[in-house]
């Protein structure tokens, strides 16, 4: 791109050095002329054959105010380019997974799972599917938000219901695979239109990827891309959930059974899924102390404190001194340390937010004109390795100790689908004190990360979303 370093985007952001690029645009560092804060600027040629930045900015605008949603600072046309300015974020979960030698501990995965499910739940509550759930599209924040997970890349997002009437999109078949084949749901491979259940099934594959280090359908060879997708589909369909989750806690089997039991239009019980993992977290004696695997690698003293408290809890049956959100927090991973490992947190963000599809994915990013919102003026707008031990045995050998979940929602459902699988009860229940402590820790974690949005900003965001909602409703639901 022929932009100069002294260019000012939207009259507010001074363009800095290029920090990434790909098939769908280029990413630059920028500095706010008003506050001096760094931001990320994504650019694409205004005359590109398949523009997507305007559509993506609309999604960002509609999601503003949600926890773990990057702030959209500005979008518009700058010279010969479409420009979108958003928060500068840290490394992706894929980057951190690689940093941790491609295996995460059960504790880290459970801490992540709670936030990841919440991010997907929020998108769904706003009427959109993500359709490309993968580790690359979840980034950690920077500075005070270094322990918060952000969801990004809405280029493949799709409206699954009318934003006002909540009418669900119709069931369809013979659809092309949209998203990343490695994490795509079975129904997506079979050509079924995606709905909320598919985002959650994809998230389940992400969690098992972190625990196992890889998935059974990785590394398959084929002559063509279509043949490779077919091989991945065959392997995924033929791999029983119990085999995929073997040697890991049965809660993961229950997670997949629930996701696959959902019918096309069913509203998922997100609270049930989070409760599955929260109860497991409590029974394992973990504390919600923000000590992820990458934190422990950078700051061994944090890991030692966490291990000591966990050991004390197992020994006495009482919470360790560090339990709960009010306990002293471990030293957090710094921006500088992140940059040391990943050649810059900025680059880590850049690589995943703008580069084109990798060999194992099939991005159906091209949109027809009727899928793009009508053009408006510029809008201002997570060192114990994965528990692959015999103590869990086969995941199907013991029942899951989880609370009963409500029956399926009262929403309209597609009649053709699989029968519902019931979760079994049993197992050792934690004490009331343990459950109260862990519930408070998890609740405190989420509430702290949301404190950055002050009342005025929420009000302004609400106004922007309402205006965007009205413009979106001028569109027909995407095919």
From Swiss-Prot:
Protein name: Casein kinase 1-like protein 6
Region of interest: Disordered: 302-337, 350-465
Domain Protein kinase: 13-282
Annotated source species: Arabidopsis thaliana (Mouse-ear cress)
Comp. bias intervals (Basic and acidic residues): 328-337, 454-465
Consequence recorded when altering residue 42 to R: Loss of kinase activity and constitutive localization to both punctate structures and microtubules, leading to disturbed cortical microtubule organization and polarized cell expansion
EC code(s) of this entry: 2.7.11.1
Region (Cortical microtubules-binding domain (CTD)): 302-479
Subcellular location: Cytoplasm; Cell junction, Plasmodesma; Cytoplasm, Cytoskeleton; Endomembrane system
Reaction it catalyzes: L-seryl-[protein] + ATP = O-phospho-L-seryl-[protein] + ADP + H(+); L-threonyl-[protein] + ATP = O-phospho-L-threonyl-[protein] + ADP + H(+)
Biased composition (Low complexity): 390-410
Keywords: ATP-binding, Cell junction, Cytoplasm, Cytoskeleton, Kinase, Membrane, Microtubule, Nucleotide-binding, Serine/threonine-protein kinase, Transferase
Active site residues per record: 132
Gene: CKL6
Location, primary (coarse class): cytoplasm
GO cellular component terms attached to this protein's record: cell junction; cell periphery; cortical microtubule; cytoskeleton; endomembrane system; membrane; plasmodesma
Positions bound to ATP: 19-27, 42
PROSITE patterns assigned to the protein according to its UniProt record, in alphabetical order: PROTEIN_KINASE_ATP (PS00107), PROTEIN_KINASE_DOM (PS50011), PROTEIN_KINASE_ST (PS00108)
GO biological process per UniProt: cortical microtubule organization; protein autophosphorylation; regulation of cell growth; regulation of unidimensional cell growth
Function of the molecule: Casein kinases are operationally defined by their preferential utilization of acidic proteins such as caseins as substrates. It can phosphorylate a large number of proteins. Phosphorylates tubulins and microtubules in vitro. Involved in anisotropic cell growth and cell shape formation via the regulation of microtubule organization.
InterPro entries with a match to the protein in the record: CK1_Ser-Thr_kinase, Kinase-like_dom_sf, Prot_kinase_dom, Protein_kinase_ATP_BS, Ser/Thr_kinase_AS
């Amino acid at each position: 791109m022929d932009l100069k370093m002294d260019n000012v985007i939207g009259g507010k952001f001074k363009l800095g050095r290029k920090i990434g690029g790909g098939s769908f645009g280029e990413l630059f560092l920028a500095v706010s002329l008003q506050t001096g804060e760094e931001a990320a600027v994504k650019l694409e040629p205004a005359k590109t054959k398949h523009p997507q930045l305007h559509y993506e900015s609309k999604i960002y605008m509609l999601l503003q105010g949600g926890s773990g949603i990057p702030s959209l600072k500005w979008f518009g046309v700058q010279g010969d380019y479409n420009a979108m300015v958003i928060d500068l974020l840290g490394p992706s979960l894929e980057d951190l997974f690689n940093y941790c030698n491609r295996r995460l501990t059960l504790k880290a995965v459970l801490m992540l799972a709670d936030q990841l499910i919440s991010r997907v739940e929020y998108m769904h509550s706003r009427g959109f599917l993500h359709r490309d759930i993968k580790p690359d599209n979840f980034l950690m924040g920077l500075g005070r938000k270094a322990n918060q997970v952000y969801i990004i890349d809405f280029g493949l997002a799709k409206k699954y219901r009318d934003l006002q009437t909540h009418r669900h999109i119709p069931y369809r078949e013979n659809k092309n695979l949209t998203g990343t084949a490695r994490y795509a749901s079975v129904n997506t491979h079979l050509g079924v239109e995606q709905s909320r259940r598919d985002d959650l099934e994809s998230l389940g594959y992400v969690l098992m990827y972190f625990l196992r280090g890889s998935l059974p359908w990785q590394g398959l060879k084929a002559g063509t891309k279509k043949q490779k997708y077919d091989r991945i589909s065959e392997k995924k369909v033929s791999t029983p959930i119990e085999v995929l989750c073997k040697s890991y806690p049965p809660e993961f089997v229950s997670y997949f059974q629930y996701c696959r039991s959902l019918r096309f239009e069913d509203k998922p019980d997100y609270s049930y899924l989070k409760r599955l993992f929260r109860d497991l977290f409590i029974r394992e004696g973990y504390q919600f102390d923000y000590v992820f695997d990458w934190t422990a690698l950078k700051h061994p003293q944090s890991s030692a404190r966490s291990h000591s408290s966990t050991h004390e809890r197992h020994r006495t049956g009482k919470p360790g001194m560090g339990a709960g959100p009010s306990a002293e927090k471990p030293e957090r991973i710094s921006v500088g340390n992140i940059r040391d490992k990943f050649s810059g947190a900025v680059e880590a963000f850049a690589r995943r937010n703008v580069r084109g599809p990798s060999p194992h994915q099939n991005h159906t990013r091209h949109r027809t004109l009727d899928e793009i919102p009508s053009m408006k003026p510029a809008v201002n707008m997570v060192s114990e390795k994965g528990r692959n031990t015999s103590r869990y045995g086969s995941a199907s050998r013991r029942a899951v100790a989880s609370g009963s979940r409500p029956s399926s929602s009262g929403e309209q459902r597609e009649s053709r689908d699989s029968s519902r699988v019931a979760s079994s009860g049993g197992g050792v229940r934690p004490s009331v004190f343990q459950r109260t402590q862990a519930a408070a820790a998890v609740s405190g974690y989420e509430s702290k990360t949301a404190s950055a949005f002050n009342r005025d900003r929420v009000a302004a965001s609400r106004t922007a979303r309402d205006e965007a909602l009205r413009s979106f409703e001028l569109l027909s639901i995407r095919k």
